[in-house]
Amino acid sequence: MPQAIHISPIDNVVVALHPIAKGTLVEVDGLSVTALEDIPQGHKMAVKPIRNGENVIKYGFPIGHATADAEPGTWMHTHNVHTNLSGEVEYSYNPAPDLAPLPKVAPETFMGFRRKDGRAAIRNEIWIIPTVGCVNDIAKKMVADNQDLVTGSIEGLYTFTHPFGCSQTGHDHAQTRKLLAALVRHPNAAAVLVLHLGCENLQHDQFVEELGEYDHDRVKFLTCQDVDDEFAAARSILKELAAYAGQFQREPIPVSELVVGMKCGGSDGLSGITANPTIGRFSDMLGQRGGSTVLTEVPEMFGAEGFLMDRCINHDVFVKAEKMINGFKEYFISHNEVVYDNPSPGNKQGGITTLEDKSCGCVQKGGTAPIMDVIGYGDPVVTKGLNMLYGPGNDLVSATAMTAAGAHLILFSTGRGTPFSAPAPTLKISTNTPLAEKKSGWIDYNTGVIADGEKTIDETAQGLLDLVIRVASGEQTKAEKHGFREISI
């Protein structure tokens, strides 16, 4: 079992794949270094002398600078490493020399649902979408009271509550309206009941205008203040929606029609070594089969955005990426916040030292394929291949945004563990084996076997593709089995 990994030949640190005790001789890539102190799993150890002010190199990239001299064997973390990040950056488009679409592979098929508009779906559910937080409990009761309608090919009746839709103005109000309308369009929802109160800011006419053309058999509306008994009215509508949803049956669909979101949360020092590279390899494999993937968490690209921007397929896509990234930075700066204060206490405990450290691991999920498009919050994926999406690092908000963009399912890597699931089935992928063993009720797939020396990234990526096809065909994720699913705007 390997003790550590030297990610790039030019790195001046290695990452402990397992806890390394003080005095242990670590041998990796022809380097022999004795640990001068205990090195926790996922944390960094210097393998070359690093002087005060000198860059700490990991992934072949500066992740910060040393704040004190460090000899080989020194633990390198928040006590002796500081970020190099500041504010906005003026980027230039320097296309990667090997920038080209990956070679195509014949797609496998999954057993999904074909909607009347031709889109593919992997679930056949009825959704209740409240337009305002005041009707949240009403929506929950409607779900509870009508579970008998979940029969035949209908796989669930769910509501996605939120506190918004009123007391919002301007951009906030527009974002709420846009996001909720995007959820109504999601193909995994065979049928949708949009639930209004009646007096909220987000009025029915506004919502219908945002929604655009829709199938009147698939989408129904109910305004609670307009009826004597909203529960009886909902029962009648839901029966109609169930009759509509029940006509869909699973059939073979090529994986080229899948849209998969890619997310990390509760990251640790192994995220960029095991789980995220596995997801990146999966992204390449799905793209070769004609499918689409979505990468977001823009603030967690800061410091590593160059990896992605040089892979934009053309200058127009590069300009959109530059605008998105600097727009997020300007948002922080305009609120008198620094751009680099992102890693959480759990991230740091797991070995992530700076935002650059976290970002270099985060972008591994993007694989090696060209970035084909950059899309806004609430906008749909329209281009095959790898897409970047405007969204924050927050787990709930970014996963909801990927669902709204049309992601059929989401791959969520984690080193610390999280039970959260978006409305789209959310697969939890552990970076380390101890987490997979401890939280078996949360984790769907373990890439810690890479750190254990049991499998390669190619092998875990193939296993992940196989699992995605099974989930797309109806196999439930751990979160689905627990009934976990929610949104945040």
Which functions belong to the PLM regions below?
Residues 1-409, 416-489:
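Metallocofactor- and cofactor-centric catalytic cores in central/energy metabolism, strongly enriched
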